[in-house]
UniProtKB/Swiss-Prot annotation:
The gene is trpD. It comes from the Bacteria. HAMAP family: TrpD (MF_00211). Gene3D superfamilies: Nucleoside phosphorylase/phosphoribosyltransferase catalytic domain (3.40.1030.10), Transferase, Pyrimidine Nucleoside Phosphorylase, Chain C (1.20.970.10). This is Anthranilate phosphoribosyltransferase. It comes from Methylocella silvestris (strain DSM 15510 / CIP 108128 / LMG 27833 / NCIMB 13906 / BL2). GO terms for cellular component: cytosol.
Length: 349
């Protein structure tokens, strides 16, 4: 408990922690060596002053050191959002992940249950019949079988149990809202990352560069969504081979129509699962368009599309010819088969 005091004392002066100090602080937190009072004070000191890149990188290093790792193809990617945008849209990144996988890109999706919305990635996938909470071997088997796999934060970041109560009691965003997407258990180097605030796009790009990412698009809708949005412009900060650049995209760039924000609202896991399945069954809707836009952006990140219009064409084709629906079916089957105790390691067909 005493080891946290010097670090808290430094934060109390308004000073920032070095990367090494941040790693030390989060090591203590993840070991359960911080009292509830110390943890709450630490998180709010960072929040009020504003987390630095060194503090984020140091925190991620501590998370990555403890996570249950997953072996994935070198070209695997993640499509994920920070959450916390307050709009409770349906599960755009989850559907985009299925579409992108259907286009031949391995997707190792990392996610959680809902925090600020009614339905997080774990919630909607469970409603669709996907087995959640698989261990590393089971995830690897499903990734090989279906081309997509889901890694739950609870299963792969057990150390987070030490902060769950404090986060719930604080009831506000903390550094943990942005750490999860930076600590993918499969160590992916390619990401489409939705961010809840425009001000975080550049800092997170710099953090991901320091953490070794190859190509990432960080996106924030001008309407506030932590997705590429179809209601208007989306702000993008792209990291590619160490270079960072900022630009905007619009739905028209992908040949898509604009939508009203109300048309993108989600609901319960059952509601969102039904909406997702309707898109996979070919129903034209604003839900389909925003999923296509995000899939198109992800396909650019994956090196499979030269621009949004080509990416949108590939994504739409994967829906219309049934490949995306087939990908979901394969994931449901593979995840349930992989979790059977009698199945030998690596035998998920």
């Amino acid at each position: 408990m005493d080891a946290m005091k010097p670090l808290l004392g430094k934060l109390a002066t308004g000073a920032s922690l070095t990367q090494a100090e941040a790693t030390r602080a989060f090591d203590l937190i993840f070991e359960g060596a911080a009292t509830p009072a110390q943890l709450g004070a630490f998180l709010m000191a960072l929040r009020v002053r504003g987390e630095t890149i060194d503090e984020i990188v140091g925190a991620v290093a501590a998370m990555r050191a403890r996570m249950l790792r997953v072996d994935a193809p070198a070209d695997a990617m993640d499509i994920v959002g920070t959450g916390g945008d307050g709009h409770s849209t349906y599960n755009v990144s989850t559907l985009a992940a299925l579409i992108v996988s259907a286009c031949g890109v391995p997707v190792a999706k990392h996610g959680n249950r809902a925090a600020s919305s009614q339905s997080g990635a774990s919630d909607v996938l469970s409603a669709l019949g996907v087995k959640i909470g698989l261990d590393s071997r089971e995830v690897e088997a499903c990734l090989e079988a279906a081309g997509v796999a889901f890694m739950s934060a609870q299963a792969h970041h057990a150390a987070m149990r030490h902060v769950a109560a404090a986060r719930a009691e604080l009831g506000t965003r903390t550094i943990f809202n942005i750490l999860g997407p930076l600590a993918n258990p499969a160590g992916v180097k390619f990401q489409l990352l939705g961010v809840y605030a425009k001000s975080w796009l550049e800092p997170l790009a710099q953090a991901l560069r320091a953490l070794g990412s190859t190509r990432v698009w960080l996106v924030h809708g001008a309407d506030g969504l932590d997705e590429a949005t179809t209601t208007g412009p989306t702000h993008v900060v792209a990291l590619e081979n160490g270079a960072i650049r900022a630009f905007d995209i619009t739905p028209e760039d992908a040949g898509l129509q604009r939508a009203a924000l109300a048309d993108l609202k989600g609901g319960s896991p059952a509601f969102n699962a039904a909406a997702l399945k309707a898109v996979l069954e070919g129903r034209k809707s604003p839900y389909r368009d925003i999923a296509i836009l995000n899939a198109a952006a992800a396909l650019i990140v994956a090196g499979r599309a030269a621009d949004l219009r080509e990416g949108a064409r590939l994504a739409a084709a994967a829906i219309d010819d049934g490949r995306a629906a087939s990908t979901l079916s394969k994931l449901v089957e593979a995840s349930n088969r992989a979790s059977l105790p009698a199945v030998a390691a690596g035998s998920c067909p």
